């Protein structure tokens, strides 16, 4: 994809009845007209709080971390030939309930980027070529943190907190003293 993008917050909020009609009629063009595209690059991070409407453009591989209490409402019912089952569209609560979830305040494009883009801050380095960057910390979101670890050569990750690791490039070995595992992009 030449110009990947996301939608984040309504730049031109629809009224609730107009929004309901757009969803019921699956008028994707009208839905998209409520947003401006935010160009994104590999490695960027955005923190999008619950209630803020958002969508992911084509060709983006991403990790989405959600709080267990987050509600997932789908505007679009069909994508790439897959039709979302009716029970998965509105959490079995109906469209009228789900329309109450959204923040309808206008969010100018530059404010969306400034407010919700998370700039990496170096957090620590490890011997041998490892660095960890803070992407999202408790002062911005008290429920979870998000960090990026980058290894350019053999290094030792030092930490005692639980984590989920996703390898996006390169390969390596994870050895916790009890188990040794080779990892590469998207391995399990």
Residues covered by each model-derived region:
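Active-site region of the double-stranded beta-helix
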Residues: 1-42, 57-171, 175-181, 185
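Conserved "cap/hinge" positions at secondary-structure junctions
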Residues: 47-50, 58
């Amino acid at each position: 994809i030449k110009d990947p993008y996301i939608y984040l917050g309504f730049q031109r909020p629809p009224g609730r009845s107009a929004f309901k009609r757009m969803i019921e009629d699956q008028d994707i063009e009208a839905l998209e007209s409520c947003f401006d595209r935010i160009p994104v690059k590999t490695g960027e991070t955005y923190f999008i709080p619950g209630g803020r409407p958002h969508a992911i453009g084509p060709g983006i591989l991403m990790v989405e971390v959600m709080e267990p209490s987050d509600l997932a409402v789908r505007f679009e019912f069909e994508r790439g030939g897959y039709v979302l089952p009716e029970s998965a569209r509105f959490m079995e609560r109906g469209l009228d309930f789900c329309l109450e979830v959204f923040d309808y305040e206008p969010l100018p494009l530059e404010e969306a980027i400034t407010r919700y883009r998370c700039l990496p801050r170096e957090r620590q380095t490890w011997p041998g070529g490892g660095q960890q960057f803070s992407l999202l910390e408790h002062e911005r979101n008290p429920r979870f943190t998000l960090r990026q670890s980058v290894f350019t050569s053999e290094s030792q990750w030092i930490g005692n907190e639980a984590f989920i690791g996703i390898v996006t490039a390169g390969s390596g070995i994870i050895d916790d003293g009890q188990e040794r595992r080779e990892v590469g992009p998207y391995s399990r």
